Amino acid sequence: MRVPLSWLSEFVTLQVPLADLLERLPAAGIEVAEVECVGADWDREKILVGEITAVRQHPNADRLTLATVAYGGGRTIEVVTGAPNVTVGLAGVKVPLALSGARLVDAYAPEGGTIVLKPSKIRGVRSEGMVCSEKELGLSAEHEGILFLPEDAVPGTPLAELLGDTVLHVELTPNLAHCLSLAGLAREVAAMGCGELVARADALAEGGGDASAAVAVRIEDPDLCARYCAAIVEGVTIGPAPFVLRHRLRLAGIRPINNVVDVTNYVMWETGQPLHAFDLDRLRGEPGGAPAAIVVRRSRPGEAMSTLDGARRELAAGTLLICDGKGPVALAGVMGGLESEVTDATRRVLIEAAQFDRTSIRVTAIGQRLPSEASLRFGRGVPAAGCPGAARRAAELMRRHAGGTVARGLVDVYPRPQEARTVRLPADEVARVLGANIPEAEVRRILVSLGCTVAAAERGALAVGVPATRLDLAIPADLVEEIARITGYHRIPSAPMSGEFDPPCPDAALDAEDRACDALVACGLTEVITYSLTDPAWCLRLGLESDASGFVCLANPMTADRTHLRRHLLPGLLETLQHNLRHVGRVAIFELARVYIPGGEQLPEEPRRLGLLLSGPSSPPWWGEPEPPL
């Protein structure tokens, strides 16, 4: 996850230097893989904010124009450009201006190539500088047009002052799903003592019709969709989002699309709640119901749909879908459908904020090969409590940036509301698990800073009320882990293991395997370890099995070519041979491992087997000797 510090600062006021923050985050289990300083390599005297004052046609080229650019202090320069968005008559637009001597990314060179700008004649006209695209500045891969800056940008200002930022590339383990948002990460930073949370109060101006009269929402399987919220914004005008919003999305690694779609991504980055925007006028209703309908259900046999990427997708049985009154309009939590996408003609938008079952979303994303930021978050767990707030936040931002009005109310279907959870933390549990004595006052402070409530319980224990946003806190060990993280693992003293250890028990079978492996290695073979998962087609082609019924099948395979547990070692050895023959002519390998034989209703048998594979000359070739036999 990419975290621009300027954006994070809207949620937490940092009170420590960046170097200290970078030291504390890994100590709490939040790895920072890279620190990207955007604009640090922009020359502050040669890469500036410019204002286009006039554009005229190039006298010798139909596809080029001459732009007069002012850059403060009465200074102007004329540059040649072929950008399609710099047209004759354009004026008053702020753009990035690079003067002679500036170093830029070469938009037409391989990744990482740069150029130093020099005065040049282009089709007979001298150009002293360049107006820049996003790619030439290193902001993104977009280079079809010039980057237009905010209207209030001051000509002559170093571009680094306007667009410069520090972006943290944060790598999060699955247990830190609550940090997949700026709000969640900000709470962690504040809990560590590195900053203070910023109080945010987002008002929502409602003025349209009643949302419940425009759409009806029905959940067929509450086990797969615990909550579904729908907000409606009417009278929108589709266009580019404001510059600040687009720039932040670029820094976060998200390509801007339009003001409506960009708002859904923006709010997801802020809150961690994935959102989707439907064209409300393209959603069909159910007979006798509201004009539009949302039905959350499993797929039916033979169903298919076209997704936003233009692909026609066959749906596996049980795939969770978002449907209207006629059929599927989205793969729930993964990707929207073409039939309901937001287009330039969209005037009414339905904003979806829901909680979907994490396992179901992972199965769909893997099966359809559609990983996304939304499916990543749903797959790790999204709390139902955040749905209404995220939907309202997105509706308000769309009202501001796309016009229109927000319909009154929120359609909120929540069949089984989540009950408040309390975890009992015994008085000695922290010291028992961590081996460190952390004062109770500090334990209370840490838990409260993470959003928990803490009350005294019997026998010195603490009754910890878990916030609805933390799905991962369920048992005392979870709370102890949080206390250890926020304290800092580096502050917990290490102690060597002590006490008596039982002597190892002799294992005749294991000793025999070790002797066999040693003997094979002494004969020149190499031991390999291959996948326990396989494709039965290998065994069918080799004649080892007549059909696939004799294999243990995985209920949720990660890939299409690793769907069953192996019955034989030979397919894995042949795959290894296939790979190694690209590099060497002689392969001598063996594997000693388990195979899996179905046992009916019982667990499969797991006998250990030895497989050997020899290919090529019987010994390595040697200079001056005849070629060895195969």
Where are these regions (language model features)?
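Glycine/proline-enriched, intrinsically flexible loops and inter-domain linkers
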Residues: L5, E23, A28, C37-G39, ...
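Terminal amphipathic helices with adjacent charged low-complexity linkers/tails
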Residues: V189-E220, A402-V430, A436-N437, L479
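Phosphate-backbone binding interfaces of nucleic-acid-interacting proteins
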Residues: M1-G209, L350, G367, E373, ...
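Self-splicing inteins and homing endonuclease
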Residues: G208-P222, A226, A394, V413-V423, ...
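Short, hydrophobic beta-strand segments
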Residues: R2-L8, G164-T173, A226-E234, E373-G381, ...
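TRNA-recognition modules of translation machinery and tRNA-sensing kinases, especially anticodon-binding
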Residues: G239-P242, R246-N265, H276-L283, G288-Y414, ...
